[in-house]
Amino acid sequence: MSSDCWTPFHARLHQLLQRRSLLPTRSRLLLAVSGGQDSLALVQLLRGLQPHWHWSLAIAHCDHGWRSDSTANAEHLRQLADQWQLPFYCQRSPEPPRSEAAARTWRYQVLEAIAADIDAALLVTGHTASDRAETLLYNLTRGSHLQGLASLRWQRSLSDRLTLVRPFLGFTRAETSKMVQQFQLPVWEDSTNRDRRFARNRLRLEVLPQLRQINPQCDRHLANTAELLADEADWLAELTEQVYQQSLSERGLCRSQLAQQPIALQRRVLHAFLQDQLQRSPSTVQVEELRQLITAPQGSCSSSLPQRRVAVVAGDWLRLQSVDD
């Protein structure tokens, strides 16, 4: 089907982009494309909307080298880009990343470099409401604070010059499947997406289908929950920063001020304090240990923290010091 054929899917995305101001007119967009159904559906809709928004579109593909068919996958996308008359950029990892986290880090480094080379201010991915639901469930199973449950935002800054945008969070994976059929898109199936050794794949292939039997709209409802949590997380982050700055001095954190705050806010302020002091995200156990020190007697201290440091009570102040002091 031609990209200039206007469908209800195009209309929905057009209205969503207007409402959320995600992809401004005449922007240069770098589209991260794997070849799967979500990213190809994204390209198809954006190509259809391009005459209305006057974007400059380019495709980027990151080849992790994990699969025997990864080179063929990249060539398939190169041919599609030629067919669509879009610039195509591809980079293969020097060696296969050892974990999903390492792959993600490498992938975003590559995409940021490509975006800088072509002067693109927006990196666009095909993450859907189903991905958001999956991420919410995944973080719940691991135990997560509010910020983790509110992950996969509509947009987030990657650097001073590049913003990641996810315009497909308004669609489910079932809907992108319908797009693939309607537009007859040549999807390249990634066999690793069906490998049940990965926790996310088990959620996608086993858990979410069971939840859909309880409520067929669970993907969208879970994604909406993540959206609500994101708004609350933003508000709490502002409040936390305000209380943190009010409680902080050269002597440490003021215990009497913290004692007046709700427990949830105490935890968030202490988390921010430890992260600033240690330059790493503290564990829940470490935060709780410090919270007990808010009302502890003079001279009390925590167990050892990273960098051979401990938290100690000094009058009305809670501060970190070296275990050697």
Swiss-Prot record:
The keyword Ligase applies. Its EC number is 6.3.4.19. ATP binds at S34, G35, G36, Q37, D38, S39. It catalyses: cytidine(34) in tRNA(Ile2) + L-lysine + ATP = lysidine(34) in tRNA(Ile2) + AMP + diphosphate + H(+). It holds the Pfam family ATP_bind_3. Keywords: ATP-binding, Cytoplasm, Ligase, Nucleotide-binding, tRNA processing. GO terms for molecular function: ATP binding; tRNA(Ile)-lysidine synthase activity. InterPro entries: Rossmann-like_a/b/a_fold, TilS/TtcA_N, tRNA_Ile_lys_synt, tRNA_Ile_lys_synt_N, tRNA_Ile_lys_synt_subst-bd. It is found in: Cytoplasm. SUPFAM superfamilies: Adenine nucleotide alpha hydrolases-like, MesJ substrate recognition domain-like. HAMAP family: tRNA_Ile_lys_synt. NCBIfam families: lysidine_TilS_N. Ligates lysine onto the cytidine present at position 34 of the AUA codon-specific tRNA(Ile) that contains the anticodon CAU, in an ATP-dependent manner. Cytidine is converted to lysidine, thus changing the amino acid specificity of the tRNA from methionine to isoleucine. The N-terminal region contains the highly conserved SGGXDS motif, predicted to be a P-loop motif involved in ATP binding. This is tRNA(Ile)-lysidine synthase.
